[in-house]
A protein has these predicted regions:
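N-terminal, polar/Ser/Thr-rich
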Residues: 1-36, 115-124, 131, 136, ...
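Surface-exposed beta-strand/loop patches in extracellular or lumenal glycoproteins
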Residues: 40-62, 135-138, 144-153, 424, ...
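A surface-exposed beta-strand-loop module
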Residues: 46-117, 138, 174-175, 521-538
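Beta-strand-rich binding/interaction modules
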Residues: 63-70, 192, 437-440, 450-542, ...
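Extended, low-hydrophobicity, Ser/Thr/Pro/Gly-biased non-transmembrane segments
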Residues: 100-203, 230, 570-574
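Short acidic/polar inter-strand loop motif in beta-rich domains
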Residues: 103-110, 475-476, 546-552
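Hydrophobic alpha-helical and helix-loop surface patches within well-folded domains
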Residues: 181, 209-462, 467-470
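Long, ordered, helix-rich scaffold segments
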Residues: 355, 382, 532-883
Length: 883
């Protein structure tokens, strides 16, 4: 390997730190271009044995001003200053180290460490940002108690915040002031936070179950406080839910949230001072959609839940990232399920998993939930670590039962509060609390790839038995050519001709053990489960509730799938039957398009959709999901060689078929779900809007042949009294060429030009348009005043939306989308390598396309890798993508 290429870090090389930092006293004198940081560290040796080991502190982009050991100022010969380190060769066993550095937050476009966003000082220290503030043992297994003093100009920065409790605040000379914060709970450096600025505040209170009165504050830019009410409500509901569901109570008297407009992530769980991308805090009916409200609920709860699963108990090393993230995503999924509709929440989570994580598991960037190596840890904040990690936790709950899982959580907290631990420690707590062996189950942490199940059911009328045979395999992934059989919890059911669940009695069980639906433990390469005393079944229902994140091959006719769509007692399986029915039809149409001979769609599918539309007992949010077709990304994953044009044509043809066949049903449902009531973000109201707009989507499928569609969409856009309905109409209109499209886009920008979050929606809508000139429009928008490469939200809204969410135009046969992607990656890398790397994944899927596209995608990756001074972030993704 050439010496200028970054090297990998391996999990197997973990060693405990040689030194521990017990207390940290920080002093900040804030100035945008020249902030001085003083750090006093109380350090003790943590190694056994003879000899003296060097102290090596991490540092990045720091100007070192002074170092003192036990009060003695060190000369240049007393330490070694490296490009990214500060080394003291032979320190004593216990000592105090004083370090003074100077940093330039205003120039920190990476948004890692201390930076300035809209005149607000802000930090982001996860994963390795603290080393950009001062020299430190910047690793998660070094936990210390922090005391932070902040000094700043009183007029420009009246609000001074850090972790823990405010213990002192006073005026200083020269128009400055100071605040001192103390966090009594030991924490790793990645959880340190500081915010200073001129901010408005929404204050509320929460009383814990033990009677503690907690002050809750959300800080935002002036003029935006009125848009924080929903986030505050979510926070209070999250605190109560965690007490009731897991017995976990908040532990300080103050909980602060700050929303900023420039942020690499969605939010950050710093102890008692959460910092949020403002898109996950600000909402009102005129600027936020139902999806935005749901996103706020998810992210606010997620970051609060980290107080115990992430802050009080943290990761030993970054390979254990899913210990906190997978567990906390599972917890926020459970919270949303309890607050809204559990079936609909499950469906939406599975849609997201299949769109983001399944392709990751099937591509060159596949990695286990607990990775074995990385070059840049920022690249492993992935769908696998988060979403698949959450599925692993969910399967634990399925295997152990809800009560058993709670016992495991209680033991985990009891054993490890205040510690930095591993995924194995969590699994051990679950196993020990329930007296079970999770050895095979833990392969979910170490094996990459999406397991594939082949399922076959056979009924024997002679003895009333049903044999269910399940074969499993996990395909090869980079570095893991051979896989062991997994422990897969598979929820199944059998339905009779009336759609009722048949009680299932496994061979060898007493009749009293029979249940309607069973969770089978699939543990071998192939197993057969035999059920006794089974009346003739009509249909087999598998992976109910999406009990395991697997792909399934199961031969079922259209009639069987239609029956399940109408009768399965498990809502997820009912939805899934429709998804698989539609997928089979559209993939068949793709093959026909490629052959040049197209037949009509099976009318049974449209009729099954009609039954859903006519079923007034169904929850509207579920009906909206049930009539929605699988996305192009899901269809692509089912193809050996992806054909984006044929997929698009097949989807549009099926949409049009449904629109024509069910026109009267669609019109009736659209009218029935209209409401004159004031906007409310509650689940029931959101469900009505979701169903009405899903129905509208089918009407729009006829735009090419019905000249009334575009004017109708423009009318609905103009008449909308909330952002959900306005965006729904505009999203459909951007795919229809004509004057109405441009009129609506111009009006939208004129209405919301002063609201950056809403303008982000305007950018994204244009980036995902199916029209042929979309890339030209995206390029033009790069020069629009609304866009800035320095702002991650803008980059994600325009460039990210085009490359990740517009497969038809991104994968244009001429390669223009790939060339644009490579060009923008190289432009963004020097500004913000973390964001540049995260947007690169679509280019790495080159192996799934035809030879011509493969060559063009590889050329884009090679162009990136050939660039000088490439960041480790982008280098890792690009090099692994090429293989």
């Amino acid at each position: 390997m050439p010496k200028d290429q970054p090297t990998a870090i391996h999990r197997q090389d973990y060693r405990p730190p040689d030194y521990r930092i017990e207390t940290v006293d920080l002093e900040f004198d804030l100035e945008p271009t020249a902030t001085r940081v003083k750090a006093r560290l109380a350090i003790k040796a943590a190694y056994d044995g003879g000899g003296v080991r060097p102290l090596v502190l991490h540092g990045d982009a720091l100007e070192l001003l002074s170092v003192a050991l036990d009060g003695r100022v060190l000369g240049a010969g007393d330490y070694v200053l490296g490009d990214k380190s500060l080394t003291i060769a032979a320190p004593p066993a216990s000592f105090t180290l004083d370090i003074e550095t100077r940093i330039n937050p205003a120039a920190n476009t990476q948004l890692s460490g201390l930076y300035v966003s809209n005149n607000v000082f802000c930090t982001q220290c996860e994963a390795e940002g603290f080393r950009r503030i001062t020299y430190f043992l910047d690793r998660p297994d070094v936990m210390a108690v922090y005391r932070t003093t902040i000094r700043a100009d009183r007029q420009r920065y009246p609000v001074l915040l850090s972790n823990g409790n405010l213990v002192e605040q006073r005026e200083l000379e020269g128009g400055r002031h100071m605040a001192v914060w103390h966090d009594p709970f030991p924490k790793p450096s990645y959880l340190f936070a500081l915010v200073a600025g001129d901010l408005a505040c929404n204050e509320d209170h929460f009383k814990t179950r033990s009677g503690r009165d907690v002050t809750l504050r959300i800080f935002v830019e002036h003029g935006k406080v009125e848009r924080t009410g929903y986030a505050m409500d979510c926070l209070k509901r999250s605190m109560r839910w965690d007490e009731e569901r897991f017995g976990l109570e908040y532990d300080l008297d103050l909980f602060n949230i700050v929303a900023v407009s420039d942020f690499n992530m969605g939010a950050m769980e710093n102890k008692s001072l959460n910092v949020f991308n403002d898109r996950y805090i600000l909402a009102d009916p005129q600027t936020a959609t139902d999806a935005d409200y749901a996103g706020i609920e998810t992210v606010v709860s997620h970051e609060y839940f980290h107080n115990w699963t992430g802050d009080r108990i943290t990761c030993r090393d970054w390979f254990q990232l899913s210990l906190k993230e997978g567990l906390t995503v599972f917890r926020d999924h459970e919270f949303s399920s309890d607050q809204r509709s559990r079936p609909v929440t499950r469906i939406q989570n599975v849609r997201a998993l299949r769109a983001r994580q399944f392709p990751e598991d099937g591509g060159p960037l596949a990695h286990p939930v607990r990775p074995d190596s990385y070059i840049e840890i920022n690249n492993f904040y992935t769908a696998t670590v988060y979403e698949k990690g959450a599925e692993v936790i969910g399967m634990m709950q399925t295997v152990l039962g809800r009560d058993g899982f709670r016992k495991g959580m209680d033991l985990y907290v009891q054993r490890h509060d205040g510690q930095a631990v591993t995924c194995d420690d969590f699994a051990a707590a679950m196993a020990d609390a329930n007296g079970v062996d999770l050895g095979q189950f833990k392969l979910w942490y170490s094996q990459a790839g999406t397991p594939e199940l082949t399922i076959e059911g056979k009924y024997d009328a002679r003895d009333g038995s049903y044999a269910l045979t399940v074969a499993q395999r996990c395909p090869p992934t980079p570095g893991q050519p051979d896989k062991k059989p997994m422990h897969i919890p598979l929820a199944v059911g059998l339905l009779d001709a009336q759609g009722r669940d048949i009680r299932l009695q496994l061979d060898g069980e007493d009749a009293a053990a029979a249940q309607e639906g069973r969770v089978l433990a699939v543990t071998a390469p192939q197993q057969t489960f035999r059920f006794r005393n089974v009346p003739k079944p009509k249909a087999l229902s598998v992976n109910r509730g999406f009990s395991a994140p697997v792909n399934i091959t199961l031969k079922q006719s259209g009639a069987e799938r239609a029956f399940l769509m109408g009768h399965d007692s498990d809502p997820f399986a009912r939805w899934e039957a429709g998804q698989q029915f539609a997928t089979d039809l559209m993939l068949k149409r793709v093959e026909e398009i490629q052959r040049g001979a197209v037949s009509a769609y099976d009318p049974a599918f449209a009729e099954a959709i009609g039954h859903i539309l006519r079923d007034e007992k169904l929850e509207t949010a579920f009906a909206a999901e049930a009539i929605a077709l699988p996305g192009a990304d899901y269809l692509a994953e089912r193809m050996a060689v992806i054909d984006v044009e044929a997929i698009h044509a097949a989807r549009e043809a099926l949409r049009a078929t449904i629109a024509k066949t069910l026109r009267l049903d669609l019109e009736r449902v659209f009218a029935a779900n209209r409401s004159d009531a004031p906007f409310s973000p509650d689940a029931q109201s959101a469900g009505r809007r979701a169903l009405r707009n899903a129905v509208l989507g089918y009407r729009a499928a006829l735009a090419a042949e019905d000249p009334d569609v575009a004017p109708h969409l423009l009318h609905l856009y103009s008449a909308a009294d909330n952002m959900t309905d306005r965006m729904a109409a505009l999203r459909l209109l951007v795919d229809v060429a004509g004057a109405e499209r441009q009129a609506a886009l111009d009006d939208f920008y004129d209405r919301y030009r002063d609201d950056p979050l809403v303008v982000d929606k305007w950018l994204s809508l244009q980036a995902v348009s199916a029209l042929p000139d979309t890339l030209d429009r995206v390029k033009a928008l790069l020069g629009h005043p609304a866009f800035a490469m320095e702002k991650p939200n803008k980059v994600r809204a325009l460039i990210g939306a085009f490359t990740a969410s517009n497969p038809l135009r991104y994968h244009a046969a001429d390669g223009s989308g790939y060339a644009f992607h490579a060009e923008r990656t190289l432009a963004l890398d020097p500004i913000n390598p973390q964001v540049a790397a995260r947007l690169l994944a679509p280019l790495g899927r080159w192996q799934r396309f035809d030879g011509d596209r493969q060559a063009k995608m590889k050329a884009g990756l090679q162009r990136i890798l050939a660039a000088p001074k490439l960041s480790p972030d982008v280098y890792e993704i690009a090099s692994k993508s090429l293989g």
